């Protein structure tokens, strides 16, 4: 148990027993921790930090009877804070993203089998140039059918048909490679 946990838990227990000064001190200490927590997560909106701190402190006050004193107080308070932050993001329609670099190890496990990648490269190479270019532009690069068609010098409709045929041919070649 950390010093902060020990101190906060003791203050909150005393506060629940009616010690107003201890309760006020506990909320003040928790407020400092909450500010730091929200500042790390709300770097783009520092004005919202104080609102979140106040909302969380109010929720802690209103829901204090749900805290099991046999459990960690800081873990319970952190959960309340996290839910308040998520509610804030939902109200503001904010989608929080995490840097991809944080998940490199996790993603590495899902890396494609090099043998499959080689077979796919071979299958792509066997397609006519226009079809290969359409597959690359639309499926790998992310261009729209209209953009890929313009690059290939054909209409969007023709690009759609050619892409469909190319994907069908690729699927057939990959099935034969597996069989």
UniProtKB/Swiss-Prot annotation:
Effect of gene disruption? Not essential even when cells grown in the presence of dichromate or cadmium (CdCl(2)). Loss of dichromate and cadmium induction of the regulon's genes, including partial loss of its own expression. A double sigF-nrsF deletion is viable, whereas a single nrsF deletion (for the cognate anti-sigma factor) cannot be made.
Where along the sequence lies the DNA-binding region? 145-164
Transcription in keyword set: yes
> Which SUPFAM superfamilies would you find in this protein's record?
Sigma2 domain of RNA polymerase sigma factors (SSF88946), Sigma3 and sigma4 domains of RNA polymerase sigma factors (SSF88659)
InterPro entries linked: RNA_pol_sigma-70-like, RNA_pol_sigma-70_dom, RNA_pol_sigma70_r2, RNA_pol_sigma70_r4, RNA_pol_sigma_r2, RNA_pol_sigma_r3/r4-like, WH-like_DNA-bd_sf
Motif Polymerase core binding, per the record, lies over 51-64
Q: Which family does it belong to?
A: Belongs to the sigma-70 factor family. ECF subfamily.
Q: Name it.
A: ECF RNA polymerase sigma factor SigF
Tell me which species this is from: Caulobacter vibrioides (strain NA1000 / CB15N) (Caulobacter crescentus)
